Amino acid sequence: MDVHLQQRALPVRRGTARLTPRGRRGHPVLPGGLGRSTFAVGADSPVVVRGEGPRVWDADGNELIDLNANFTTLVHGHAHPLIVRAAQRATADGASFGMPSRPEMLHAEVLLDRLPDYDQVRYSNSGSEAVATALRVARAATGRDKAIFVRRAYHGTSDHALATGGEGARRGVSRAVLDETLVLALNDIDALVRAVAEHDGKIAAIVLDRLPNRAGLLPLRVDYARRARELCDRHGIVLVGDEVVTFRLAHGGIAGEDGVRPDLLTLGKLIGGGHPVGAVVGGADLMAEFDPRRGGALEHGGTFNGNPVSMEAGRVALDLLDPVAIERLDGLGDRARARLAAEAGDAWEVRGRGSLLRLFPVAGDAAAWQLDLWWAAYARGVLLMQTALAALPTVLSDGDLERCVDAIAEAAREVAARRAADGDGSG
Ligand SMILES: Cc1ncc(COP(=O)(O)O)c(C=O)c1O
């Protein structure tokens, strides 16, 4: 065998010895032991070692049904054979290149087939990059700086996107960015009209997610979305629809529902089939901002933009998420929400749409209740998001769904009883 292809033992790393028994806790070579602030669940966060289909296994050997799905990304579960094969083939043919490659073009064709109102797409490596890039297009096209967001709606980790969060999220964001970011309450039409009037001629973009999770997983009202569209038309503002999460809910996403067509869409997560991806989609007019043949085009690169592995895996993921798959997920979601509403107890409210659902305490410290629920569901073999959001994958069997609902309902009742005993919320 070619010496370069021989398997060699990996060098033992200095830090390995410092892993806690069975690797159960985070590693001290990572700040806080973790790689993302969204992983934080308290001091003793379990570590995952493997995923297959709708399941993951942790370092203690626990098996869980994964409704976290890497924060809604893995709409077909882990290691779907067709997606794995596509990624393997793409890797074998060269994982990334310094020139255009066909997988990017094929992915764009498949994506735009689902979005007939749009002409072109520019890829990046995350939803955060996609939102930041869409904002830059809006600023370049309008010659203005300000952008309107919904309070607490999450749009990633760019400075502008973090400005929508609370004090903690805004730490480290420059005063200049905070000043250009107008953050308004969800569905407050009067506030939107006032902000546009007050900052007339200075607003480049309104950024909307039709079902913003961190803002409470409550839908943007149709009249709000339509008014935003009207204001954009009247005042020359670019409407950006963030579909990084919601694209899983309908074949062409939900940003354009009710006759509201955003000028730009931002995508990510599922469209990479579990590999890093982000995308800005738009009409030819705005997307011309990226065209390097045009004078004054935007500078936009990215070493891994449109890399063949994400593109090929993502194309298969998109193909598999056809209307039939989405309809089945809608049915599973409706069943889960109905059962949880009936069985989780009066202390909880169940919200969501399609394959997304989330539990909220009717009173008390929501984040604390939801984190407790994360642990209580974990103990019963179900992995939620730390905000108690669940994303159902297409590979979930009907039996698995019922098991998940049993576990979450029982966990919810346990948390409510404990919190009531501690005097937090209505219990
Ligand atoms: C609505 C929305 N937009 C943007 C992002 C950022 O995507 P990424 O984490 O890929 O940067 C997220 C991430 O969860 C999101 O939920």
Regions found by a protein language model. Give the residues of each.
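Conserved N-terminal phosphate-binding loop of PLP-dependent enzymes in the Aspartate aminotransferase
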Residues: 3-427
